[in-house]
Amino acid sequence: MADMASSIQAAAATQPDGMVISLPDPDALGAAIKAAVAAGVPVITMNSGLESSASLGALMHVGQPEYLAGQSAGARAASEGATKALCMIQEAYNTALVDRCEGYGESVPMEFTDTTSDPATIQTRATAALQASSGVDAVLSVGPHVCEAVAKAIDDLGMTVHHSCFDLSPGVMDLIGAGKVSFTIDQQQRLQGYMPIIVLHLYNNGAGLLPGANIPSGPGFVDKSNASSVAALAGIDR
């Protein structure tokens, strides 16, 4: 995060027409973003950081309301039989990922498992957590690489659990097709990169006009019913 804060400071010093910044850790990045705004640089946050965006002076946020997405995932998992879950989280400091877990937990009681982002470590920690947790019948993996590694752990243990995930990858799509993942939540990252640039263009060329609210890019469910259609858009609209 320190390197990212330094990059924000360096970019702001060039006085760009605008900056689009992901905000995974408001405490670590907030001062750099406030300084950019104070220097007259229009800032739009994207992906992570919805709750802190306005307080740091950003014009708006483009991204998925992560708590809502977690709530949606949890409600669906509960309707599909989940009663007790582990939430596999690769960045315990990332407020967006925490929100996914906590939103899910409104419908399905859950405990956090800090997996780190290393695939081998994810599988090892997931295996240990699944073995140690009595009564767990569901898992939420809040990133695609986490989803793939956790699926391997579940397979190796010979367990049958409800597994749902966040975000897309070829591996996640294969797991959905094989019936090993019930669904994944698509936050449409392409829109998170595209829409802020459109908004900044309008802001800089349209007398400072902005949309009337933040732009939500998700959540959307991808499951067996639509996975092939979504996969066909890879590299085109995703």
Regions found by a protein language model. Name each.
Residues S107-V108, L191-R238:
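Hinge/cleft segment of the Venus flytrap/periplasmic-binding protein
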Residues L23, L59-M60, K84-A92:
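Short beta-strand segments enriched in small/hydrophobic residues
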Residues M60-A85, A120-Q123, L168-V172, Q187-A207:
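Hydrophobic alpha-helical segments within soluble ligand-binding/sensing domains
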Residues I44, H162-S164, S182, V222:
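Structural detector of well-ordered beta-strand residues that form the stable sheet scaffold
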Residues A31-L68, S169-G177, V181-S182, A232:
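Flexible loop/hinge segments that line or gate small-molecule binding clefts
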Residues Q9-A38, Y104, T115-L175:
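Hydrophobic alpha-helical
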